[in-house]
Structures are given as C-alpha cells and as structure tokens.
Amino acid sequence: MRERKITPTTRSIEWLEAHGWTVDIVERRVPHAFITHDAFGFGDLLCFKSFPDRGQGPWIALVQTTTGSNMAARRTKILAESRARLWLQAGGRILLHGWRKISKGPLKTWEVREEWVTL
C-alpha cells in the first residue's frame, strides 16, 4: 500500500493545532500554474497561541514550511525579505518548520525541526 502524499504545510497545520495553536493557510496558489505566493514573501501559515501558564500574552506567528533538507535555503530567503524584518519589529514571530522522514527500526515516521527566526 502506497503512503498518501501529505505536504509539509499539512503536516505543520496538524502539528501546530495539536500543540494548541490556531492556524490558517495564508499562501495563495496561482490558478493554472504550479506556483504559490507566500504571505509577505515568507509565510505559508498564520497562527496564534496564548501562553497563560507563562504569564505571557498571546503570540502571533507566520510559519514557513519546507522539507528538512531545504531549511537553510528558506532561512536565507526569509532573512533577505525586508517585510520579514518589519514583521519581527512589529512584534510578530517567524517559525520555520522543516520536515524529514526518519527510520525507527521497521517504522518510518515524520519529524519536524522547528526554528524561530530572529534578526
């Protein structure tokens, strides 16, 4: 039986929601083309979460999702984007999610690497 194809974006939505984030997709697909446009040039998902146990107000974040092997390229892209700097200065956060398949004996499982992007 073949494994169904799940995108990094779908994996991140499921992971974030399981960890208490409220999530929405903000990347746009171009009709009749195989291209997507990220929000502000770097965001696939917009999410927010409150941290009452930490005594902190809610966080808002844009999430860039990718494969584990493509994280460095995505980080470089984000850091080169002037709107990313403005987003961070305005109090938003940027989270980079890199997904990779790992083997645990006969089982194959997906693992996320999270990286908060800062100036």
Sequence positions of predicted segments:
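Catalytic phosphate/metal-binding cores of nucleic-acid and nucleotide-processing enzymes, i.e., regions
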Residues: 1-119
